[in-house]
Amino acid sequence: MPSFLEAPVAGAYHVLTSLVTAIEPLTGSYAAVIAIVVCTLAVRLCLVPLSLRAHRGLRARAELMPALKKLSDRHRGDPERLQRELAKLQAESGTSLFAGFLPTLAQMPFFWLMYTLFSRAVVAGELNQLISGSLLGAPLGLHWPVLTGTPAFLVLAVLLAVVAWFSARLALRQLDETATPLSRRVARLLPYGTLLSAAFLPLAAGLYLLTTTAWTVAERTILQR
């Protein structure tokens, strides 16, 4: 790992271990699990302004869909002209077609930190205390293929699947009548990618995915009302 990345990793490690130490008298062996959930919720709370902006961007994009379709049909044979017209339309409307990706992009550094903290035996020059934490008896630093058949794997897999199902329903609800069968199929299946991704990550990262996707579902449900 490049040396300039060691500082944020060490900082995150000391924050997380301090939180674990503070709550361990009350939570016992689940201190690391609760610390991951608390930190994830804190990050998502800080990202609420971006989520609100993304929601407004998605609504604006939905309103622009008829105009976007007309431009696509009109300039189908001239990609350069189409790009210029799309950029002009976005500038006039004050929105961006990529606004919906802001919360996801902003979470990437935190996700990388979580993966790094629970996949290394040594952090900040000392033995990693975090990987000794466990969930239903399964160490947080182990990967899911090793945990197949254990209660931790089964519970987390079921919960991720349930959250993905709700996420797919919300995604389908956001599509309008112009949506193609392919886009509907993608919206229905894409949320289950978190379940597939978690299979190749440490258990702690799977817990992070469960927490953040559950937050996303709750947040979108509230914003769509």
What are these regions (language model features)?
Residues 1-225:
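Helix-loop-helix
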